[in-house]
Amino acid sequence: MSDASDASDAVSAPSTVFSRVAASAAWKRLNRLMPALAAAVILLMGFVLIAVTPAGHIPDVWAHTYRIGGIVNGDVLARPVDSTSILHSGSGNVGGCVSRGWIQFSIDHYDGYDPAAVNADFLERYGMGSTTAGSGTNSTSTANTNACVDTPYNNAAVNSPVAYLPQLAAFAIGAASTLTSGTTYVLAEVIMLLVYAGCMFAAVAALPRWRLPMALLLVSPPLIFRYSFAISADSMAQALCLLFACLLFSCMADPRAGNGRLAALMTVGVLMGMSKFTFTPLLLLGFLALIPCHSAARHPLPRLTAPRIAIVAAGNIIGFAFLAAWMKLTGWFTTTPSIVSYEAMTAKKSQLFADPFGAHGLFGAIASIARAIITGQSNLDSRMQTLVILSLWAVLAVLLIVLIVATAKRVFSARMGWFWWYACAVATGIILLTYLALWLQYTPADATGVDGVQFRYFLPLSGIFMLCACECVAGLRRRASHASHTSHTSHTTPRDSSTASESTAVPSVADAARA
């Protein structure tokens, strides 16, 4: 009976091994296809969303549309304008000269969703007469007043043209081909979607591991909805930030990552910072990629050489120099002067350190931000936004606990351990900086907490948190498995040891078959 059982085991063992080999080959094939699959799903969902999302039904879309129109007409930097809109209804408005066709298009498609749109009588009030463009006393423009009208867009004026490169290409094609505003609007969304999908393809392809979890994150509806195609600075910023996270992990986790990959990382990082200046601190993480990776791999590992230092240093210098210059060029106005005037914002800023214990001092700001986080305060007190924001902060809290446990159990090398702590700290700091910016520029002096918070501010940084979670959980599972195996081995009897040694011979059959 025992001999028959042994014979049955001997027959079944090779078939089990071969099935495992086939499964491993299928998984490797799927892993290779993962970038293309993720990009295909994003394109499919993106085109469906473009078809079903009405024009103008995206946050701040009209402000971004006006901003792009102003850049096309020569107003690369915003300037004071006398005109008003639904959101910017008072003084202190800045903007540029926007083509009449785009203004009329926004009026025709205004559905009450985005208050950045101009009023219905805008062209009658500001588009008549023969004055030159830039009717404000301090404004100048290269555009012709017969073709465009000064339009306010404070909340988009802080964005650099880099954030709108895909849409600028669409607007240029539309102008050259004399397309209607409606056709150009859709063209801009399509080009943005293609760029976004390309970035996500490159992001997944750059990963040495965790392609499936990252692909699932990238195709999740919250990330694709709106900001995979929207006419918005946030679309480009989100695409570049997610790509940067994957390239950064690739440079840290792959011992063979060379100068080319490091240069790609810093190039994407500089463009990311130019698209949204609050992401610029992420460039500092590039210095961690300079730490040599000690490995027993047969391939020679990149060392700390002058070219590698120069690549990272140049990226940081360019990124932070652009940040300083752009903030100086755009620091003379506020994003919503009808809610918080420039004078009120400057007073708040000056009191941060002048009166740190006051209501508008440093500790007052910290208390307001803490209150907003604990209560999940959201823009317009949206219950859905509040629940999502609270959930996201809860996820970050759980990730912190997991990271602490993983560090305590030493599942990382010292190099990767420092990296994950710094990466999560910088990413969380960027979210907190966004809270501070909203407290300064969007929250009235008599308000409690922080107004204007939206869960979309978390999404571009989700790639860093996802990869950290994968590394922590995998490391803890390996450590638990190793501990369990060690415990089992220490209690094995001589008979069990003999059986175990026989069973360990089975994989050699698979190796022979694979060879």
For the regions a protein language model found, what residue spans apply to each?
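Membrane-interface helix-loop-helix junctions at transmembrane boundaries of multi-pass membrane enzymes
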Residues: A297-P307, V402-G429
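Interfacial juxtamembrane loops and adjacent helix segments
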Residues: D75-Y185, S487
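Start-transfer (signal-anchor) and selected internal transmembrane alpha helices
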Residues: M1-F47, P307-N316, F419, S481-S484, ...
